[in-house]
């Protein structure tokens, strides 16, 4: 038995999809455990670029099981559209398994999400407006509708009718928006469920059986540790737990069955949406990194905020997710920058702190303490091993490992699979 969790160590968009796709080659089952279609994964497979939001990266390997876990919130319409997108490109999806316990996103979740973000004005969180938060709210309030409910028309109608009474009052009286009629949703969404019911099962059984049979299972996180609802920059976070601990809740696999946790980190830092970002750059270097790194959101298309690598953030990720390995991505983007900076600590009211603070007021007053390292000018996109990297690039990676306390086991120097390189296998048994 061998299992690996892939988590983002920053604010998402670290290249998890690419690393998951790379590691999928040696996995026999790949599972997502939280989030929904608010997360975007860009994957290159056989020379074709795919953009996925719900379906795990492992879908391209038809001999491997690809799982949408119970911790996810699934927009049935978006799922049907994504399946069609893959089918139109000739991708076989018969290896997909969808948890019957996953909750669904309905049109009223999306409308409430949009209205609430608009209402907050300057205090907006930066949600993708996909209905994720309201769906998780219903789940916590025990009024959510699960996929197993969607497949039974009588149950779906009963639960939907009950929820619409409350949601319409909220939309009409508080947000002053039009509500929904039962018939607006019932037939359309029941039909969506019928289109993917062949994939629906108890995915906890599927995953545990695979592990008990000695198979390799890969768990694919969405977003990143700093967007975790408990450990991130609350309230500028997502509504679920992207940290490694979310795997056990969101997949139905116990913690004793997790072997390694791979933290994916960009060689710099980015963030989409509002919220604190201590190392953010507002100069030409930031603009250069954004353009060279194509730093625009997969889901929203919004320009990402860009900053220097922050070891305080990744140390926090190491601690709360129990990172065993680090995968450093987009090293090639930094080529040509004369002097690189790594944030080693923060200054808060004249005092040096080395751990990420919980208070947003404290964060707003934090000034990054930088260590400067010489950059490199050599093209590294064609290297095939660690030894091929320029000495300054290797020193940069070594310093990141020292400052974060996590070994760099993989690094990436471009978007293609062949540009991801292994220093130490994360599939090791010890």
Curated annotation (Swiss-Prot):
Enzyme class: ligase
Residues that, per the record, bind GTP: 12-18, 40-42, 304, 330-332, 412-414
UniProt: IMP binding residues: 13-16, 38-41, 128, 142, 223, 238, 302
Cofactors (names): Mg(2+)
GO biological process: 'de novo' AMP biosynthetic process; IMP metabolic process
The entry's keywords: Cytoplasm, GTP-binding, Ligase, Magnesium, Metal-binding, Nucleotide-binding, Purine biosynthesis
Quaternary structure and interacting proteins, as annotated: Homodimer.
Functional summary from the UniProt entry: Plays an important role in the de novo pathway of purine nucleotide biosynthesis. Catalyzes the first committed step in the biosynthesis of AMP from IMP.
HAMAP family tied to this protein: Adenylosucc_synth
Protein name: Adenylosuccinate synthetase
Annotated organism of origin: Listeria monocytogenes serotype 4b (strain CLIP80459)
């Amino acid at each position: 038995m061998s299992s690996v969790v892939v988590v983002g160590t920053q604010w998402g968009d670290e290249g998890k999809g690419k690393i998951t796709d790379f590691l999928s080659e040696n996995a026999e089952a790949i599972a997502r455990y939280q989030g929904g279609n608010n997360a975007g994964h860009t994957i290159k497979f056989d020379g074709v670029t795919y953009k996925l939001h719900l379906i795990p990266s492992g879908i391209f390997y038809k001999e491997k099981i690809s799982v949408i876990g119970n911790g996810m919130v699934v927009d049935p319409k978006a799922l049907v559209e994504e399946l069609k997108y893959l089918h139109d490109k000739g991708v076989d999806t018969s290896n997909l398994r969808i948890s019957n316990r996953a909750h669904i996103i309905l049109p009223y979740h999306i409308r409430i999400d949009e209205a609430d973000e608009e209402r907050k004005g300057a205090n907006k969180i930066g949600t993708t407006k996909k209905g994720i938060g309201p769906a998780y709210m219903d789940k916590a309030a025990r009024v959510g509708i699960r996929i197993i409910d969607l497949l039974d028309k009588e149950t779906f109608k009963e639960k939907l009718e009950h929820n619409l009474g409350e949601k319409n009052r909220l939309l009409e009286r508080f947000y002053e928006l039009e509500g929904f009629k039962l018939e607006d949703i019932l037939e359309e969404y029941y039909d969506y469920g019928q289109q993917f019911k062949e994939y629906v099962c108890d995915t906890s059984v599927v995953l545990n059986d695979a592990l008990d049979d000695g198979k390799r299972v890969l768990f694919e996180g969405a977003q990143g540790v700093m967007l975790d609802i408990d450990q991130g920059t609350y309230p500028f976070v997502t509504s679920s737990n992207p940290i490694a601990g979310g795997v056990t809740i969101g997949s139905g696999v116990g913690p004793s069955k997790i072997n390694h946790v791979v933290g994916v980190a960009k060689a710099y830092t980015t963030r989409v949406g509002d919220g604190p970002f201590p190392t953010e750059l507002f100069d030409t270097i930031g603009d250069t990194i954004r353009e060279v790194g194509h730093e625009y959101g997969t889901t929203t298309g919004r320009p990402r905020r860009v900053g220097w690598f922050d070891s305080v953030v990744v140390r926090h990720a190491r601690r709360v997710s129990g990172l065993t390995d680090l995968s450093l991505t987009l090293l090639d983007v930094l080529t040509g920058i004369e002097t690189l900076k790594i944030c080693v600590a923060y200054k808060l009211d004249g005092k040096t702190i080395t751990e990420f603070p919980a208070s947003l007021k404290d964060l707003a007053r934090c000034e990054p303490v930088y260590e400067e390292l010489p950059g490199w000018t050599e093209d590294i996109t064609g290297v095939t091993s660690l030894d091929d990297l320029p000495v300054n690039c290797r020193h940069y990676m070594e310093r990141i490992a020292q400052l974060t306390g996590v070994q760099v086991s993989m690094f990436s120097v471009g978007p293609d699979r062949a540009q991801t390189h292994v220093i130490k296998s994360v599939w090791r048994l010890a």
